[in-house]
Structures are given as C-alpha cells and as structure tokens.
Amino acid sequence: RKYYNILMKHRMWLEMKRVLDVIVAGIMLAVLIIPMGIIALAIRLDSPGPVFFRQARVTQYGRIFRIYKFRTMVDNASKLGAAVTVDNDSRITKVGAFLRKYRMDEFPQLFNILAGDMTLVGTRPEVPKYVKKYTKEMYATLLLPAGLTSRTSIAYKDEDKLLGEAVDEKSTDNIY
C-alpha cells in the first residue's frame, strides 16, 4: 500500500510514459518490420518449429501475460534440458546465438508494449514460479509494468554466465 500511494502521486508521469511507450514502440516496429521479417525467415530456415517463443510472464499487479520473443533454441527445448540456459547450450540454434548476442530476440516484445503488457523501461518480466518466491518488498515491483529493459537486465546482462556458475536449480533460484 505504501508503494502504491507513492506511485499514485506520480500518476500523470506514468500516463505520459505510456503514451511515450506507444509512440516509440510504434516507430521502432515501423523501422524494424523488414529486419524482423528477415529474422523470421532465418529462424524458419535454420531449424524446424515456430518463429516465436511464447511464455507466461508476470506484469503489473501480478497479471499473467504471454511474452513474445524470437525463438533462439530448438523446438521443445524445455523438454530437452534445464530450464535455465548457459553459454554453449547445445539447444541454442546458430541463428539463435546471433540473435541473443545482439539482443534481437527481444524485438517482438515491442508488440507486448503496444498491447499494454509491457513498457520500454520497467521491471523484469518474471516467470510466475519465481514471483511466488518474492519477498514482501519484491512484490512492490509488480506495481509497475514489466519492461523490455530494466536496471536488472543491464546489471546482469551476462545472465547466462551468472546462471551457468550456479551449481544446481536451488542455487539458481536464489539468484532471483
């Protein structure tokens, strides 16, 4: 409640941020539509399966939404190995490695921004199983929409390396 009251004092800024998100995401999609088409074709030619990876994530007020990314791993990768990917994971496709290196796999999230599920800069769009482990203070992050980028994403840009150093799933969970 305390954090909610703080945010409500800045309600006008949050509404202006939403307008800016829509304008910027729209412009970025207009610029990126042809490269995104080329990426989609490259994914289809590189490995069988869908072009997009879809996954349930948590956004503002704990609402579940479906995040979109370009698929960077073989189809049904979650059935072939750990939920967490690390460097040199054999499930990552050739095109996928390139997309991940330059963060181009996240371009489809611009559609999530237009839909109102995400914002350009916000909190990390987390998987529901990790949100269940949030502390009381961490739940305050759910007062804001999930972001395409965030302070956490920048601070842990080498997330694969960090997670690769975790010994088991329990220690991986503790990172979050």
Regions found by a protein language model. Give the residues of each.
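N-terminal hydrophobic signal-anchor/signal peptide
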Residues: 1-30, 136-140, 160, 164-176
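A hydrophobic, helix-centered structural microdomain
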Residues: 4, 9-75
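Juxtamembrane loop-helix boundary motifs flanking transmembrane segments in multi-pass membrane proteins
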Residues: 4-15, 87-91, 106, 122, ...
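Short, P/G- and charge-enriched loop/turn segments at secondary-structure junctions
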Residues: 42, 83, 138-142
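Short, glycine-rich, amphipathic interfacial segments at transmembrane boundaries or analogous
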Residues: 53-91, 152-176
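Short acidic-aromatic low-complexity motifs
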Residues: 102-109
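Hydrophobic structural segments characteristic of membrane proteins
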Residues: 112-176
